[in-house]
Amino acid sequence: MSSVNQSLFLLLRIALNHSTEECDALRNLSVVDWQRLYELSKRQGLAAIVFDGISAVMVRLNDKSLGMPRQLKLRWLSLLDSIENKYDHQYKVVQKLAQIVTSQNMPSVLFKGVTLSLLYPVPNHRQCGDIDIYALGGRGDSLDKAIVDAGGKLLDVSPKHSELTLGDVMIEGHRYFVQRYFSKRAKWLDNRLVECANNSDTFIEGTKLYAPNVQFDTLFVIYHAANHFKFEGISLRHIVDWCFVVQRANCNISEVAQLGLEHFSAVLCRIGRDCLGFDFPDSICQCDEPTYQRVLNDILGSDLNKSDENVSFFTLLKRKYERFSSRRWVYKLLGDTYWGGIVNSVVAHLVHPLSIFKGSK
């Protein structure tokens, strides 16, 4: 493993409160190494958290620079400020949603981003994307209308979810938690998630906005990561999310086997234990060495920030084909088949034809 990758994991272990190990080696990083560390942290969706680790090391060693170029430190601080501001703005929109669903007596579950951030040592340092919300009782259309009446804009509606904006923040109003028409497994999962959602925890006290219980997150987070891993790859942020969920569940994740994802989970848990310092037992980290190394290398070498927006239709098709064909090896790990994946993809595009024009963002 390169010195930059080793430094990344060291800083993450420190930031996640898992390490008091020696960190003098960070002073030996070159200017080029620091730049690579910054870019790698961004690609992995963990730039703010890595900087938390850097700040802790600076205090521990009483060294305000560690050899990091001043301009790079300023750029990193600027990115940190941007991440915090985006999170804080998104949280205000979440509070607005809480007011909306409460005034309309429309119990709803917030899931993914903001709710997962509360598992982190510094919640507003976990980068979040869209806001994902599910109106209990199948009231997705009513929730869309309530958001629009409150000043939001409805952009699109697909079988799985609508797309809206409120306060310039993208919101996905879910009809389903997963693409339930993909397979029997997906249908079972969506039904199970609805069952879990009906027993959610309060997110904002005194409102009708709820957060998933641990059973929901145990199933949804690993399935969501597996889908990303299948089609485009995942970042270390997916692994940190999963490890915090496993920690919250006290390592009781046996229901993951119902999804056929116990082997994938074991690889992620081992990365969490060996590289990120999570205290997991061998029983949930058992995987063969070649698979472990291949998954780890795939994650460290991925660039999920590459956008498919504003490219031609044929370029988009070409990229989708290249991604799909290059990831044939992952299907066995995910308890799936390559040809089954092709069928599922075709079904998804038939159900929502315009989705073929949408790429990675």
Regions found by a protein language model. Give the residues of each.
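Conserved NTP-donor binding/palm subdomain of two-metal-ion nucleotidyltransferases/polymerases, i.e.
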Residues: 1-129, 135-361
